[in-house]
Amino acid sequence: MGKSLNNVPQAPLDVQFDSNDVKCSAYLYRPTTEVATPMIVMAHGLGGTRRMRLTAFAERFVAEGYACLVFDYRYFGDSEGQPRQLLDIKSQLEDWKAAIAYARSLDKIDPNRVVIWGTSFGGGHVLATAANDNRLAAVISQCPFTDGFSSSMAMNPITTLKLMGLALKDKIGSILGAKPVMVPLAAPSGHTALMNAPDAYSGYLALMPSGSNIPNYVAARFVLDIIRYYPGRKTSRIQAPVLFCVCDTDSVAPSKTTLRHASHTPNHEIKHYADGHFEIYVGEAFERVVRDQIDFLKRIVPVK
């Protein structure tokens, strides 16, 4: 993957944008160029932050001439919002809308060539977002969460019952003004967590930057919402071209369900990977997927 001398990436800027009066933090990457460039707006999945391997993808994209805005959802990472670690689907979709609006407002960015890139839970968010924004140039949905019921059924029933109990306790507590009841995002098999498949805990830890203290938990009330979230059902309304990067052995977002929803997308491409949900961020699996994503970008939203 050669770099053009005109596209040598600058160090990212740490920026903020407003989302319903809450400041969201982001890295803004720009290629060295004097012309308006396409912009890729990026965010992570379940409890993830911009520091968890998203910068690796952004660095590859900016080296090819694309600007990137990599943001943290409110309540997470470096973004504002209380209580911390509250995963609220409506708020996160609002953050996507605000991030796109901010990207379109920037100088030397072509507002008609904005791409959105999401992974895991964020891979579902970009589908829901694109269904309501016909101005987007393209969508990349990586190992996406598409169906709350399907993902819930992939879990051990006993774990599901325990999570529901914690969620109800947290929800009731939130009404009474109590502190949030937290539940682990990832844990070893047999432990209660949102992700406890055999590859989940080690895979999640592999995304953490060295020496980081990113919390591995979220407010449990989220469990009451995830089972009712079906972003995959909106794919038939998406007008932009969509690249689905599907992990065939995905333990978190079942690939069979993803493929069913992807088939209803009017303009879509599907790339298969014989990798698990967490493998795609690192090593050879990362090299394969980022190469395919760059190929898609160059064909669909080429840098002028």
UniProtKB/Swiss-Prot annotation:
User: What InterPro entries does the database record attribute to this sequence?
Assistant: AB_hydrolase_fold (IPR029058), FrsA_esterase (IPR050261), Xaa-Pro-like_dom (IPR000383)
Keywords for the protein's UniProt record, in alphabetical order: Hydrolase
Q: Which residues form a coiled coil?
A: none
Q: Which GO terms describe its molecular function?
A: carboxylic ester hydrolase activity
Q: Highest taxon of the source? A: Bacteria
Question: What would be one Pfam family of this protein?
Answer: Peptidase_S15
Is Chaperone tagged as a keyword? no
What does the record say about induction?
Answer: Down-regulated in the presence of H(2)O(2).
What this chain does, per the record?
Involved in quorum quenching (QQ). Inhibits motility and biofilm formation. Could contribute in bacterial competition, as it is capable of hydrolyzing the signaling molecules that mediate interspecies communication.
PANTHER family according to UniProt: DIENELACTONE HYDROLASE DOMAIN-CONTAINING PROTEIN-RELATED (PTHR22946), POLYKETIDE TRANSFERASE AF380 (PTHR22946:SF9)
Spell out the family assignment given in the record's similarity comment: Belongs to the AB hydrolase superfamily.
Entry protein name: Quorum-quenching protein AidA
Give the taxonomic lineage as stored in the record: Bacteria, Pseudomonadati, Pseudomonadota, Gammaproteobacteria, Moraxellales
